[in-house]
Amino acid sequence: MAGHSKWANIKHKKEKTDAQKGKLFTKLGRELMVVAKMYGPDPETNPKLRDVIAKAKANNMPMDKIMGFIKRAAGEIDTTGYEDITYEGYGPGGVAVIVEAMTNNRNRTAGELRHIFDKNGGNLGQTGCVSWMFSRKGVIVIEKESFPDEDFVMEKALEYGAEDFTSENGIYEIITSPEDFSKVREGLEKEGFTFIRAQIEMIPQTYVKLSSEDAQKMRRLIDMLEDNDDVKEVYHNWEEDEE
């Protein structure tokens, strides 16, 4: 379905291994420290930090660990030179791929990502080559099992300014404009909702199907990109088969 994130298209989320969780927490921890160091360690006065905290909580990072990273940022840790960079390219079968990274060495990161694309039947492209195929939106995902009253969830989401609400495959997916994301998320938090995903994403406007051979290459490409230490998020318009 066009205009919805991958959550609405995949019935079963794969459980992350302990190693994957550890790597994810390391990346989120670095993001927390950099944002806290650059814009201040108080979430009340740092909206960027509030958004990263929400993202970390949605990925099951314990609050004491989140606060530990923020406290470290107030110390002597060096976060200079880090910047957010977005890379664009193509996977096998012409799949559009967007990679969001945080790096302190853009040449190193670009070289590593180019190698990963080349190795898996894709190529790293120029800025703007595929981003026009995506829409930047806030995405909030809630498990139905935790909050079975669908009408109430939808009512509250729309009340706080959500653009769209869908209910399928055991989840509610709430879409917001990037500008209203924090307002909607914080409003729903005050109502007592918890999220399994809460962040601003690039959502494909159309999806591409792949042959089984290209699908294997694409899965490998995504896994290798996500495994890279500098990569925060990978977005694509491959229509994965439901398992």
UniProtKB/Swiss-Prot annotation:
GO molecular function: DNA binding
InterPro entries listed in its UniProt record: Integrase-like_N (IPR017856), TACO1_YebC-like_2nd/3rd_dom (IPR048300), TACO1_YebC_N (IPR049083), Transcrip_reg_TACO1-like (IPR002876), Transcrip_reg_TACO1-like_dom3 (IPR026564), YebC-like (IPR029072)
Name of this chain's protein: Probable transcriptional regulatory protein Athe_0816
Keyword Mitochondrion: no
Subcellular localization(s) per the UniProt record: Cytoplasm
NCBIfam families on file: PRK00110.1, PRK12378.1, YebC/PmpR family DNA-binding transcriptional regulator
Keywords linked to the UniProt accession: Cytoplasm, DNA-binding, Transcription, Transcription regulation
HAMAP family associated with the record: Transcrip_reg_TACO1
Pfam families, alphabetized: TACO1_YebC_N, Transcrip_reg
One GO biological process term: regulation of DNA-templated transcription
Similarity remark: Belongs to the TACO1 family.
Organism: Caldicellulosiruptor bescii (strain ATCC BAA-1888 / DSM 6725 / KCTC 15123 / Z-1320) (Anaerocellum thermophilum)
GO cellular component assignments: cytosol
